């Protein structure tokens, strides 16, 4: 079964039996449930819902089903076409729409697609709202419009430009300094919408560029998750010389990774760290990232006199905590930069513009910038369990076991995280599989992996 239902929407592979995969029947059901939720919430007087999509091969089909269903529910559709996730989020607020649906499976392979659901603020639904949509879908508790009240359909392809204009207007984006730096970059946009919008952004910033996998045809040239193991092509291109850096995005352009001028990874965890360091140097304040993100953000925040706070994993949890503590910047260690001066959503365009501004001001190489930050390494492991295992009970036992130790800070807002003076380990249960994900960080990869393996053995001994 490859249809996964969650509070943020539904995702699955295309094709196969109804109910088991992402198919037209389930797309109609969940789109109808979402439209019903928006109507009942009464949060917006608008009768328009924005639809945007990445360049996946199945995107056109899914878009047609989504738009037709929304019109059948009586909603007007504003289709912004091929667009990034942050562009679609901004389109909701710019147009004053009641909500939005992003058609993208983010970093998942080409056979996947998904519906991501937005509220009237262009932000992902809260847990309670998401559960309400799931409940409506389960009961099929929706009613379609009669012939006199069907929705209208409009297309508007101007939102890429509006997004870029909004990025260029940010006070900390120094367009002049970037132009004067005469940067040359190599970009891997993984055959999706980054290949459409990033050339326009880089042109506006006066950056010379070469694109790899720049055709937005959805036929991904490699696994689209922006991890080192998938990026051999662009790393080899950087090693040839002649570039200041490499830029990598995922298919919907909400994740961002950099590559140093020598072809070595900057480190996806350090995308947010580097951008935050620049933002905090200009506008001191607080920061937020999720529990599984590098401690380097905390170090950089405290260096600038701010307070770092950890949130549960998930963008909506991070943005909620950012609002609570009035964070000036935040995000997730997977390369997600959230800058409230722009909007409360991960945005690679904002990340690129702020990073280039920082680099232009510092006048150093990207590798030198990376060397200026605290060095941490994250190991990722998993514990496979039987379906009958009580994962929650195991996590409670881990919490109780380490809760008595003096030098360990225990956090249980999302699984169990154990913070030691010089390292940490985070255990999270999966919502879709009988596994516990184990993330651990230390000053060397060997130490991080050893800590993770130690906790894995603790869990095995508890069964």
PLM ranges: what are they?
Residues 71, 131-165, 260-333, 337-338:
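Proline/glycine-rich low-complexity loops and linkers
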């Amino acid at each position: 079964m490859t249809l996964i239902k969650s509070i943020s929407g539904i995702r699955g592979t295309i094709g196969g039996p109804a109910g088991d995969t992402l198919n037209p029947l389930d797309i109609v059901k969940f789109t109808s449930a979402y439209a019903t939720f928006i109507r009942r919430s009464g949060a917006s007087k608008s009768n328009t819902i924005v639809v945007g999509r990445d360049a996946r091969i199945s995107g056109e089909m899914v878009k047609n089903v989504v738009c037709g269903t929304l019109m059948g529910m009586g909603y007007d559709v504003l289709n912004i076409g091929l667009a990034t996730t942050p562009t679609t989020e901004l389109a909701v607020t710019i147009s004053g729409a009641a909500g939005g649906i992003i058609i993208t499976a983010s970093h998942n392979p080409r056979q996947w697609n998904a519906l991501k659901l937005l509220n009237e603020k262009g932000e992902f639904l809260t847990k309670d709202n998401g559960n309400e949509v799931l409940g409506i879908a389960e009961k099929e508790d929706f009613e379609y419009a009669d012939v006199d009240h069907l929705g209208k359909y409009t297309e508007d392809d101007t939102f890429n430009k509006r997004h870029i204009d909004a990025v260029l207007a940010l006070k900390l984006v120094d367009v002049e300094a970037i132009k004067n730096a005469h940067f040359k970059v190599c970009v891997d946009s993984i055959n999706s919408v980054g290949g459409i919008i990033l050339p326009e952004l880089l042109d506006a910033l006066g950056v010379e560029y070469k694109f790899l996998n720049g055709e937005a045809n959805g036929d991904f040239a490699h696994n689209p998750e922006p991890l080192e193991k998938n990026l051999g092509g662009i790393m080899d291109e950087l090693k040839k010389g002649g570039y200041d850096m490499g830029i990598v995005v995922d298919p919907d352009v909400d994740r961002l990774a950099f590559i140093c001028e020598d072809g070595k990874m900057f480190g996806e965890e350090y995308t947010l760290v580097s951008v935050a360091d620049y933002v905090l140097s200009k506008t001191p304040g607080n920061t937020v990232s999720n529990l599984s993100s590098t401690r380097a953000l905390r170090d950089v925040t405290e260096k600038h006199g701010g307070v770092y706070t950890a949130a549960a994993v998930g963008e909506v949890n991070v943005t909620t905590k950012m609002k609570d503590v009035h964070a000036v910047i935040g995000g997730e260690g997977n390369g997600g930069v959230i800058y409230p001066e722009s909007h409360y959503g991960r945005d690679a365009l904002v990340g690129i513009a702020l990073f280039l501004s920082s680099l232009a001001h510092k006048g150093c190489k990207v590798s030198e910038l990376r060397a200026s930050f605290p060095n941490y390494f994250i190991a990722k492991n998993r514990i496979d369990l039987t379906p009958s295992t009580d994962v929650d009970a195991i996590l409670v036992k881990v919490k109780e076991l380490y809760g008595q130790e003096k030098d360990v800070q225990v956090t249980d807002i999302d699984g169990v995280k154990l913070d030691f003076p010089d390292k940490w380990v985070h255990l999270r249960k999966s919502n879709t599989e009988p596994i516990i994900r184990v993330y651990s960080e230390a000053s060397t990869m060997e130490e991080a992996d050893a800590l993770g393996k130690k906790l894995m053995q603790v869990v095995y001994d508890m069964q």
